[in-house]
Amino acid sequence: MACRPRSPPRHQSRCDGDASPPSPARWSLGRKRRADGRRWRPEDAEEAEHRGAERRPESFTTPEGPKPRSRCSDWASAVEEDEMRTRVNKEMARYKRKLLINDFGRERKSSSGSSDSKESMSTVPADFETDESVLMRRQKQINYGKNTIAYDRYIKEVPRHLRQPGIHPKTPNKFKKYSRRSWDQQIKLWKVALHFWDPPAEEGCDLQEIHPVDLESAESSSEPQTSSQDDFDVYSGTPTKVRHMDSQVEDEFDLEACLTEPLRDFSAMS
């Protein structure tokens, strides 16, 4: 049986006859082509992605959301914000349920005790903060204060059942209505009080002693009071490094003793 001679490659014959480019390889035949029939290039994909990003609207809607939501360029911060919003809403519902249970128990104790008397459910108090943006901002400030070595040492050395009001620092209640100035002051005093549990300074480190601050006055009022202002007068500096300023001068200059002291002969000493 005679073997049939193989024909020369197609692209070789074309190259010999004319200057047309060779046919593409088999693996490149499945590539996507543009609308005009040309092949895709890497720079074409980047241009298309850039044009698609420019055409994206600034906001979008979802079936679950009642209003449009703005797009976020940083996905990590968006996820963190959503987790914090979910946590704040859960804590707010738990705190509201706790208030209702406590008020319901007080009403039952103060009622006449008759079976036909109907007790009305207590409503949420007027000083209850329900603004989600305010609660999230306060939660961020609390998280910033708790993410410290001093707070870790504090919760380890002083368990919750051993903490005494007025002696140990208490986290400000973010669900109570406070002015922005009053809340920031409470957070600052709370952070200053936590510095009492800072790790001990190493030898050779010139750090001054940190004294605890009483937070009872700042936490019980919605506006800044004189006692809180006195604390600020005594303590000055940033929350990370607070120094105790002594108002009295230890060594006072005595003018009379200086005048009566005999003059020294500095030339003889030299």
UniProtKB/Swiss-Prot annotation:
Motif (Nuclear localization signal NLS2): 96-99
Gene Ontology cellular component annotations, sorted alphabetically: cytoplasm; cytosol; histone mRNA stem-loop binding complex; histone pre-mRNA 3'end processing complex; nucleolus; nucleoplasm; nucleus; ribonucleoprotein complex
Stored Pfam families: SLBP_RNA_bind
Gene: SLBP
Keyword set includes Lyase: no
Residue ranges annotated as motif Nuclear localization signal NLS1: 31-34
Modified residues (Phosphothreonine): T61, T62, T171
PANTHER family (UniProt xref): HISTONE RNA HAIRPIN-BINDING PROTEIN
Region: RNA-binding, residue numbers: 129-198
Domain comment quoted from the record: Amino acids 31-34, 96-99 and 241-244 are necessary for interaction with the Importin alpha/Importin beta receptor. The first 18 amino acids, amino acids 69-76 and 179-182 are necessary for interaction with TNPO3. Amino acids 31-34, 96-99 and 241-244 are necessary for nuclear localization.
Basic and acidic residues bias locations: 37-58, 84-94
GO BP of this protein: cap-dependent translational initiation; mRNA 3'-end processing by stem-loop binding and cleavage; mRNA transport
Regions of compositional bias (Low complexity) in chain numbering: 218-228
Quaternary structure, from the entry: Monomer. SLBP/pre-mRNA complex interacts with ZNF473. Interacts with the Importin alpha/Importin beta receptor, LSM1, MIF4GD, TNPO3 and UPF1. Interaction with LSM1 occurs when histone mRNA is being rapidly degraded during the S phase. Found in a ternary complex with ERI1 and the stem-loop structure of the 3' end of histone mRNA. Associates with polyribosomes. Identified in a histone pre-mRNA complex, at least composed of ERI1, LSM11, SLBP, SNRPB, SYNCRIP and YBX1. Binds in a cooperative manner with ERI1 to the mature 3'-end of histone mRNAs.
Function as written in the Swiss-Prot or TrEMBL entry: RNA-binding protein involved in the histone pre-mRNA processing. Binds the stem-loop structure of replication-dependent histone pre-mRNAs and contributes to efficient 3'-end processing by stabilizing the complex between histone pre-mRNA and U7 small nuclear ribonucleoprotein (snRNP), via the histone downstream element (HDE). Plays an important role in targeting mature histone mRNA from the nucleus to the cytoplasm and to the translation machinery. Stabilizes mature histone mRNA and could be involved in cell-cycle regulation of histone gene expression.
Post-translational modification summary for this protein: Phosphorylated on Thr-61 and Thr-62 in the S-phase. Phosphorylation of Thr-62 by CDK1 primes phosphorylation of Thr-61 by CK2. Phosphorylation of Thr-62 is required for its degradation by the proteasome at the end of the S phase. Its degradation is not required for histone mRNA degradation at the end of the S phase. All the phosphorylated forms detected are present in the cytoplasm. Both unphosphorylated and phosphorylated forms bind the stem-loop structure of histone mRNAs. Phosphorylation at Thr-171 increases affinity for histone mRNAs.
GO terms for MF: histone pre-mRNA DCP binding; histone pre-mRNA stem-loop binding; identical protein binding; mRNA binding; RNA binding
Positions of crosslink type Glycyl lysine isopeptide (Lys-Gly) (interchain with G-Cter in SUMO2): K98
Annotated compartments: Cytoplasm; Nucleus
Effect of R138A: Inhibits histone RNA-binding and localization to the cytoplasm
UniProt keyword terms in alphabetical order: Cytoplasm, Isopeptide bond, mRNA processing, Nucleus, Phosphoprotein, Ribonucleoprotein, RNA-binding, Ubl conjugation
Assigned protein family: Belongs to the SLBP family.
Chain intervals for the UniProt region annotation (Disordered): 1-132, 215-241
Result, substituting S59A: Does not increase its stability at the end of the S phase and through G2 and mitosis
Name this polypeptide is given: Histone RNA hairpin-binding protein
Modified positions (Phosphoserine) in chain numbering: S20, S23, S59, S182
